[in-house]
Amino acid sequence: AEKICIFFYEDGSRGRDVLTHFLGDAELKSIMTDGYNAYVFIGDELKSAQFKDTIHQVCMSHANNKFVKAANQGGEPNAVLFSNDLKEFFIREHLYDDAGLTSEERLRQRQSLKTKEIVIRVRSRLDAELAKEPEFRSQYYTEALHYLNHFWNELFAFLDDGELPIDNNLAERC
């Protein structure tokens, strides 16, 4: 399938008004963001009539990068475990791409027992880490954990639809 990348920049701002003006009355299946505060409202304010069915996704690469930073700069060994698990999703997505899977076939793979095992492992580890005293974690690790927890549904929305991407790297690399 042909992939489309749109880069939009207006008056030096990434604010809400820029996004809502740009989107106008477009009908979108999904929109992916990086968790930037101005875009968090997508789940609420943009759920007007034309956006009520729009799926808000958050880029998995951004989540993974937070754990990489927590491991490398924060010295958090458990951050590596999260990063390795999140990378499993990327590995699986590359395999689906290489196999030329249709969106229906991709969805079946995303719904597989192996995928569910990874999700359960990540969620269990996340809950266990969040239950620990925060003063014993680095700032980077705390940020990564809270990001993953806060955007859990948006990060894993791709698992429920074979057409949705796992990340917005295509747009990031334009």
Regions found by a protein language model. Name each.
Residues 1-174:
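Catalytic center-proximal scaffold of phosphoryl-transfer enzymes
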